[in-house]
């Protein structure tokens, strides 16, 4: 009945809290790139440690890809970039094609563990669903990952020139 926060990229803090709450831990949720707090990337060693540690239990591994999904990392999803496979992926923003829509995608073994049909109060907003349909259809029609790669190369080339300015402290990504 509680949410335990761990210091981002701190293996020791994660391990201590995991040991303290391991009998009551249902899931580990991670936002792989914390955009709001300044584009902080999860460390691959930290992510690997989490995945390896919780795979020994029934703890679910959840990726919050609301911000990172659909090509924003140069991959369809950030978990592909980090080479891990979560049990559940949370999606939003882009998938609605500009309209509010959230999606919880999960492995079949989890989906099949819910008896009967599931629903929510605002399920099935037809306008958001149609917008999502056209957004996903458009992604199939264009080679969007190739376009993203070209933009990435362009910005990486030109950011070298920007680093010379004193007001530029850091580049991430």
Regions found by a protein language model. Name each.
Residues 1-173:
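Conserved N-terminal phosphate-binding loop of PLP-dependent enzymes in the Aspartate aminotransferase
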């Amino acid at each position: 009945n509680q949410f335990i926060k761990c210091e981002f990229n701190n293996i020791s803090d994660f391990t201590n809290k995991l040991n303290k709450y391991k009998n009551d831990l249902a899931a580990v949720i991670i936002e792989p790139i914390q955009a709001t707090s300044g584009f902080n990337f999860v460390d691959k060693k930290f992510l690997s440690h989490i995945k390896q540690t919780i795979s020994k239990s029934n703890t679910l591994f959840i990726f919050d890809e609301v911000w990172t999904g659909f090509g924003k990392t140069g991959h369809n999803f950030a978990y592909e970039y980090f080479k891990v496979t979560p049990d559940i992926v949370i999606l939003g923003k882009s998938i609605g094609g500009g309209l509010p829509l959230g999606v919880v995608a999960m492995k079949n073994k989890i989906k099949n563990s819910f008896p009967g049909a599931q629903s929510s109060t605002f399920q099935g907003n037809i306008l958001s669903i149609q917008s999502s349909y056209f957004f996903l259809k458009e992604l199939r029609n264009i080679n969007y990952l190739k376009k993203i790669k070209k933009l990435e190369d362009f910005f990486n080339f030109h950011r070298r020139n920007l680093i010379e300015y004193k007001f530029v402290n850091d580049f991430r990504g």
